[in-house]
Amino acid sequence: MKIYITGLPSGYEVEHLVRLFYPMAPLTLTPPENAEDCVWAEKTPDGLHTLVRQDGRSAERHAPLPAPVEQGGETPEFSLASLTYDLLRDWTGIRPPWGKMTGVRPVRLIHDKRAAGWTEAEIDHFFLDRFDCSQQKYQMAKAIADLQEPILKVGNEPGTYSLYIGIPFCPSRCSYCSFVSCNLDRDRKMVQPYVDCLCREVEEIRIQADKAGLKLCSIYIGGGTPTSLSADQLRQLMGTVRANFDLSKVVEYTVEAGRPDCTDAEKLAVIKEYGATRISINPQTFSDEVLAGIGRKHSAQDILDCYAEARKAGHDDINMDLIAGLPGDTVESFERSLRQAIALDPENITVHTLTLKRASRIVIEDQKENDYADVAAMLEKCRLLAEAGYRPYYLYRQKNTLQNLENVGWCKPGHEGYYNIYIMEEVQTILSAGAGGSTKLVTDGGKRMQRIFNFKYPNEYIQRFAEVLERKKGVADFYDHDLGTQTSG
């Protein structure tokens, strides 16, 4: 299936709506005559036209041009996208659970509409009618927005920020992963120079944050796999964090312990000793067959042993990640994994839906969406989490996620992950250290934003580290400008 879009300066919205029905369909700029197996959306001086052809059959829809936006009309792009959506919904018999929504932050939309003074009835209409969102998904997003409100008040306090520290090393690469990460065995010589630079960048972040008058709210050490570092390297990094920041005033300090094949009792003890209040142990599945298929070099029993060691080390706020839709998984196997996670009784369980990233091995090897299990049926099993006393506290979506579904963090009451909420709802400055880091500077509740990017690859980050430090000066410059804007005139 191919996508053709003509007559619009940008076909972004149409393209992504078509991919709700045909996830890997390529966009082709010049349609041939008598194109087959395609979706063709076009704006002409006469109106809007959309056509689908597949397996020798075809259907089409037409509509007049919308009224100008200043007169209350929709943009031509949204109108053409909506026309195409209606055609494909009828053609395929599929109603995407999030309707026409292609954005990654539906909960943020609810917060924004409320802040703008919309009534609950107006927000209901926006989701359910204008975007054809299902009642189930909308009610979940709305419940999450309600739960987040008091937490966002903490993150919205003027001058607060969170610190992200990235460790781009893994013992092996999972088949679904597209993140920039280095194989630990191949790139081990790079690890210590990387940690040395990382510690220096953390120190520079503290200097720039102090100059800007910022107060640290939460810390997140992620990856990659942070526990691919040695115990001594973890001590070096976390010792630098402790030496530069008052951890007693931090509401949350998370370290991704990640994979049991590189997480041992000593590392878990170091993480606890140096101030982390929350860790994540990520099985993804408790099926040994599925683990082997995605390239994990450990067993389900290794996960259970790692979890027991974490409890023994005193960790009392643990998240576990599961992924719905992994190659070779089934609804029944996913349910067993979910029940196993619930039986362990962690404070958080996060359920991700597999996303087909173009740089991941499962896409490069040309596996199709039909190769995957019924992911919607898997996510239906998350009712077991609610029955066990967990509640959803954050939600986000990604492009090319199987069956247009979502990722949801579930928690026991009082164990909401603050950093996850802050980064998803974009209400707080995030200062990022490490290769691939993206610092996001935010003021006025997200109305003004600026990004500062680190170099993407670890070797480039190390070799051009002086430039990394120079770019970090943009933090204080951003807030100097903001202060000057507020006090001038």
Regions found by a protein language model. Give the residues of each.
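Radical SAM enzyme core and accessory elements
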Residues: 1-108, 112-116, 120, 129, ...
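A C-terminal junction/extension of Radical SAM enzymes
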Residues: 34-36, 355, 359-433
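Short beta-strand motif preference
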Residues: 50-52, 165, 279-281
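N-terminal [4Fe-4S]-dependent radical SAM core
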Residues: 88-95, 115-163
